Amino acid sequence: MNISYYTIQAGLNPAVGFGYAGKNIVKSLNNLGHAVSFANPKSTIQLNFTQPHHFKLHRSQYQIGYTPWESTSMRLDWVERFNACDEVWATSDWCAQVFKDNGITKPIYVYPHGIEDIWKPRRRVVKEGQPLKFLHIGEPSPRKDGQLVVDTFIKLFGGNPDYHLTIKAHKFNTTRVYDKDNQFGSPEIAYGNITLITDELEETDLVSLYHSHHVLLYPTWGEGFGFIPLQGLATGMPVISTYDWSHYMDYMGPLKLKSKLTDETLPKAVGDEHIGKMFRPDAKHLEELMREVSYDYKAYSGYYFAQADKIHEDYNWDQLTKKAFEHLVEKFS
């Protein structure tokens, strides 16, 4: 089948979610024998994978509108653009329900993202003399709440060499703390057991970063899909994350982080303003889970490692893509 793929220029960058997902969508379509071109009005179908106001809707072409979203409300012009498509795709059941609740009337299908083989499971142990290493990825997005991670880590383990926190930021970091001299600055300057990484990493280096850490901390207010927790889970890593938004919540396990659906606004210093409600992470529960996993790491490590192979089976890109396009293959064959 001839398929046109469309996104904006920024959506081609594999260092961000749209680009990373898009790369794998196109690759899996090619693996399945489909011919994929870019913004081609002559193709039978066009998959628009970007924010709805950027959709490129050619006439006389079957149009699919596909985007992730993180809150309970959407812009009215987004709803109009979705309804101008022939069908709409969502990245999770939660996201699909949000689309329906906001007035999208076209058929809605769920096409979750997948995981690549490179995210291999690894059994993790804390060796004698080695610190328990926590990892947070997502700065500078306020939605990923890196500040909550830093504040909680310092409260529990600040300055304790038996514990370490790595903050992996995309180019820059917004988390701030006061040091012993009451100076306000970046946490890795004030605490010797906190490390900051701002460089963009190749995928192999990113996988190695996951493999070299013991616990992923991800108190997000919501995700369109949530690659970061899925990648951690696929490597067998214990993950502390909110989950109500998640397509893969069944794999979140005993470290699921409680949250509350609220209309409290996020900080607006970085990123787009979100309207509607989002899932505010429970700060006290995050503290409890971090203590719990540090007390009994061996048990949690075993639990999450044991389910990793099943995650790779359920979130295989080729299988997910084949299922998503089955009704279109039947319709246009």
Indicate where each model-derived feature is located:
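N-terminal pre-catalytic "stem/leader" segment of glycosyltransferase-like enzymes
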Residues: 1-45, 49, 327
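A charged, aromatic-enriched C-terminal amphipathic alpha-helix characteristic of glycosyltransferases
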Residues: 17, 277-288, 295-326
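Extended catalytic core of nucleotide-activated donor transferases of GT-like folds
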Residues: 33-103, 205
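Conserved donor-binding/catalytic core segment of Leloir-type glycosyltransferases
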Residues: 127-144, 150-153, 165-167
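Nucleotide-activated donor-binding/catalytic signature segment of Leloir-type glycosyltransferases, i.e.
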Residues: 177-207
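Aromatic "clamp/platform" in nucleotide-sugar-dependent glycosyltransferases that forms part
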Residues: 221
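Short hydrophobic beta-strand element within catalytic cores of glycosyltransferases
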Residues: 238-242
